[in-house]
Amino acid sequence: MGIFDELNLPAGVLYGDDVLKLFQYAREKQFAIPACNVTSSSTAVAALEAARDQKAPIILQTSQGGAAFFAGKGIKDSAEKREASVAGAIAAAHYIRSIAPIYGIPVVLHTDHCAKKLLPWLDGMLEEDEKFFKANGVPLFSSHMIDLSEEPVEENISTCVKYLKRMAPMKQWLEMEIGITGGEEDGVDNSEVDNASLYTQPEDIWQIEEAFRPISPYFSIAAGFGNVHGVYAPGNVKLHPELLGKHQAYVSEKLGGKDKKPVFFVFHGGSGSSKEEYREAISNGVVKVNVDTDLQWSYLVGIRDYILNNIDYLRSQVGNPEGPNKPNKKKYDPRVWIREGEKTMKARVEEALKDFNAAGTV
């Protein structure tokens, strides 16, 4: 028995109550779903293929920078309208929606880290969501993430409330962040923040729950428990996933104590974390774990090794160790070397699915 049997979910991109059911099931069964940042059709299919082969759900997400890359680096992305990142995110969404069903797994289609300066990007996507919802009864994206963790708590919550009210009629999921994740990722740089800012307080979690619950049940919280974006050796990041358990207990008591884990938590900045740290966080209600930095590296590894191993076939179009007139087209065809990156990225996603207990849940 698994997700399809117990929850009656479709293959392909999920929306609304199906997303809620998936996260409830993950929290109950103590697994988390990797959220893979994708920047192209190639990175998207690598993650989908990994999830298919591991019989697991997957979350595919685009950051603002990743979405702009999807549209093309030659397109202007103005601060006022974010034309390229809006168009790129929409293009990625339609592409993923089109191919996800043939992989036979549940997929959540998400956008990542929308800071205050990037809200025009979110506005543009929500306009498209509303048009799509009017025509199809579901939004284009399953969910969006707003990251106002650098702003005052009151501003963070009130802004998210405004957007949640807009998203609620579409039953669209909102992920928000409270407590700063250190380090730097995709233009959001918190590498110089005070360490105390890396730990969210239980009162903040309750303030969010109290504000959001009357509007919609479709939300999750990326809380800070020492998380840091970027690349760090194991042991160099001091995580305290036990704090998430204390947050759950605090909110549970406020709600009457019936539900012992009422909060959906998200784990950001996990590079260098141990399997034990991941699993402790998952046991405390983490249902989504962001995976970006490691996937960038893993994708490169396959391409790098292919080039190094075939360098004598890649110096010219004609001529190689087999003869001066031998063609090299089969070696430099992009479908060959890009596929090598997909293979190594796929392997890293499969590792994450196993580490987060998600493998075999479909």
Swiss-Prot record:
Residues that coordinate or bind Zn(2+) 1: 113, 229, 268
Keywords: Glycolysis, Lyase, Metal-binding, Zinc
Pathway: Carbohydrate degradation; glycolysis; D-glyceraldehyde 3-phosphate and glycerone phosphate from D-glucose: step 4/4
GO MF assignments: fructose-bisphosphate aldolase activity; melatonin binding; zinc ion binding
Entry's EC annotation: 4.1.2.13
One GO-annotated biological process of the protein: gluconeogenesis
Name assigned to this protein: Fructose-bisphosphate aldolase
Species assigned in the record: Neurospora crassa (strain ATCC 24698 / 74-OR23-1A / CBS 708.71 / DSM 1257 / FGSC 987)
Name of encoding gene: fba
